[in-house]
Amino acid sequence: MDIPISLTVNGKSVTKTVDSRTLLVQFLRENLQLTGTHVGCDTAQCGACTVHMNGRAIKSCSMLAAQVQGSQITTIEGLAKNGELHPMQAAFRECHGLQCGFCTPGMVMSAVQLLADNPKATEEEIREGLDGNICRCTGYHNIVKSIQFCQSGAKASA
């Protein structure tokens, strides 16, 4: 059954009609062409699909698009402002917090939430905060380093 939904995505009002079974991640990727949100496991285990809903990190593969009616959604594409990377995105680039890049959008979205909740997070707290995100390439060292770089307020080189 098709249903209408209205929400705000990356600061823009969106009204679409979707199948009631459409997952939020499918809606973002297929209806809005926001392909930075990745589908990894499709079971809310890997975190590749992490986006922010009303300022909180969620796994978009575990929510129906209809469940976000009236919400504000921010995807990885919505973090950058006026052509400038978000400080966390810049930190990941600066500190080589990625290899293949598949997990990076979800990792960045989770990291932004992590520091919003705990700006003075220790390395252990950062590692615990990334618990819901899986990276098969990096071993997490440079991911943690990236988050600490952002946390320090240091500016990434251009």
Predicted regions, residues:
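Signature of N-terminal electron-transfer/Fe-S-associated modules in redox systems
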Residues: 1-158
